[in-house]
Amino acid sequence: EYSKHPDTLWAPWRLSYIKGNDDTAVLPDPDRWRPGADKSCFLCRAAALPESYDRDIGVVARTDQSVVILNRYPYTNGHLLIAPLQHQATLPEIDASVLLDLQQLLAIWCQRLTRTLEAQGFNIGLNLGQVAGAGVPGHLHWHLVPRWPGDVNFMTSVAGTRVIPQALDDLWNQLRSCT
């Protein structure tokens, strides 16, 4: 009986993630990969491609040591990944100046997301190793997830569904203009 089932919330953009499709595969290979890069790693690709591809890959900011990129499969609107440019899997591998840069970017982007999206809180996470849930176990990165009262984050844990109110392309425009 239909009344026993909850309403359906369609999220067709998730299918490419579930199937393991990499829609960045249509991008050209960088002219020069960074030393130690993994050519199958989307974070290494983002680090190596020129800024002219930032919109295509979702890069909203770069420093000489780090990159800030939109999560293509976000938990909430504004979900960012903050990663070192180098393909490194563990904290001890990362130089202290890079760690400082990453932490400063976390603080800066908390402020920017608060101002731009009116975020009222954040979940900040780092999954080290595949057994800890790292989707890209060889290239560590922080998740910066903005939160709001009533943001229905329960949907992820209860129904495996996320409700994102804004297209990634629109969000990229908004976040690039706040820098």
Regions found by a protein language model. Give the residues of each.
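C-terminal helix-cap and adjacent tail motif
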Residues: 1-5, 9-22, 147-179
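Short histidine-centered catalytic/ligand-binding loop motif
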Residues: 80-104, 157-164
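Active-site microenvironments that recognize anionic phosphate/pyrophosphate groups
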Residues: 1-77
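Long, well-ordered alpha-helical scaffolding segments within enzyme catalytic domains
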Residues: 94-119, 169-176
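Histidine- and/or cysteine-centered catalytic micro-motif in compact active-site loops
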Residues: 46, 71-73, 85-87, 127-129
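Histidine-centered divalent-metal-coordination microenvironment in nucleic-acid enzymes
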Residues: 79-84, 129-154
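Divalent metal-coordination and catalytic microenvironments
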Residues: 41, 68, 84, 102, ...
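A short glycine-rich, hydrophobically flanked beta-strand micro-motif that places a catalytic Asp/Glu
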Residues: 117-132
